[in-house]
Structures are given as C-alpha cells and as structure tokens.
Amino acid sequence: DIFGHSFTVFIDPDAPADSRYRATMSIKARHGYYTAHSADGLKWEYDQLVPQWRSNDVITSIYHPGQKRAIVALKVRPYPSVNGIPRRSIGIAELRDGRWSEAHSALLPDELADTDAVSRGYSCGDYYGMGMMPAGSGTVGVLWQFRRSDMMHGVNDVTLVYQAGRGERWEHVPGRPDFISHADPSFGQGTVYTSSCPVMVGDEQWLYFTAYARIHGWYIHKDKEIADKRMQTVIDEGLSRIGVARWPKWRLFGFRSDPKGSLTLKLDGIREPSRLLLNYECEQGGSVRISLEDMPGRTEE
C-alpha cells in the first residue's frame, strides 16, 4: 500500500481501532518524512499526502507507554552548520492525542564529538540517526556516531544517550564510550545502523543492527558519482549482515559501588501502591542496604 526508506512501525494502544498501527518513513523523491496508519499492520494509508516533516533520510519512532506518546527521531536537513561545517544532527517530534508535533533540534554534534572523531583518525563527528528505548519515565537513545573523513565517507559507531523525562535535555553517558563499535562484528566491520528499538526476548533485551562490510559511501566518489567497480564488489560480496546486541533485561545502565557508595532514587508521581524491584549483584562479602529517606526507620539489608 505504501513505500518508504527507514520504515518504522509501532503500535499506539491509545489510538482508534483504524489507527492502532502507526508508521514513519522517508520518501526522498517527495523530499520529506511521512506518517501512516493501519488497523491491522497490513493495509496502510498515509496520514496525509504531503510531508509531515520537511527533511529526509533516517527516521525512527517508538511508542513510550510511560509518557503516553510516540517519539520520533529524525535526521535534520538541510544540515545545520557547526563551526562553518554542515553537520548531520538529530531532531525530535512526537505523537500525542493523535496529533503529530513539529520537529525540533535535540542533538547537535559538539566539540567532544569532534575530539573523539579526530582521535580515531577522522575529521569530525556527526549524528547520523538514533534508535530509542522507553525506560520508566525516561528514554534511552542509541546514537549513531558518524565519524567521517569527508562529507560522504566514514563509519557509524553507537553510543548511549538518555532523556530523564519528556521535554528535558538529552544527555550523553559520561565518557561517551562505544556501546557498539563498527569494529566489533566479525561479519561486517564497515559501519553500524541499529533498529528503532530493542525487543524483549525472555530475560534479555535484544537490539538488532545492520553491519556493513564497507565504510559508509565506499562505492561513491567524493563528487557523489558511483564507482562502478566498487559497486560491483558490493553486489558480489553483499552489502551488509544483520546482528544483535543482547543484555539482561533492564541492565543496560548500572551503578557500581566499589568499595562503598550510595544511590538515591527519586520516585515521582506514584499514585498507587507499588513495588520497588532491585536488580543487583553482590560480590563475596558485599551487601546492599535499602532505606526510605522520608521514613528513617524503614531499613532493609
């Protein structure tokens, strides 16, 4: 029924029956990002015949049950200029109460992104795209760090960012270590693109990703013309392979007390009796003590 690049589908449990399935996509020929709806995920209809957002290329979307909204991450075009250089960056939009919002800039490459890229032998660092994961009242982002030698050629590594709540600033994990490096997969060490979100598999969360055998734009000259011999090599070898990153459920982020430390959790907005489940691991001789700050006598060990 419909077509598009960077196609993402999610379920909106609060939508009318005929729009239970939602989709976002890029259509280059129409110079925009589009949205669509479906009752069953099979027969689709565009929400409108003009772009929802005037840009194109990479777009991902998820439904966030804790925030009762869908979140869209999209590559911003035309590229904003940073220090006189056009840069790829991430914009954010949302779907609330059946209405799509305008997109606004959320993640723009900074000096640390460039410093990291230069330290690895590249000229600068862009943000190519981002998958996302609901996490309580917040959101985790898996950010595609495009470390490039020129506008076309480079590699994607994946780092983690997070947003504590709707409308708050996106923060990088301290130190910005690679979560997935393009050099990690033995089956493709060119560049990495993740899916829009992880999925639950038993007691684990799985994030599927595509690993390219060559760097981004390997078969394209700097003048943007296709190099025929390199393109044939890509056809013969295959462009990419699919892999998966796995971790124990809800153990993507953690806190380590070595040998001592404390962590305060602020649980806002609790309107009914709830359980606090601690996902922890103690080494030999270690212990965990839990207390409620507003009830000093309530301590468990």
What are the residue ranges of the model-derived segments?
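Beta-rich carbohydrate-recognition and catalytic domains
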Residues: D1-G125, M133-Q189, G202, W206-E301
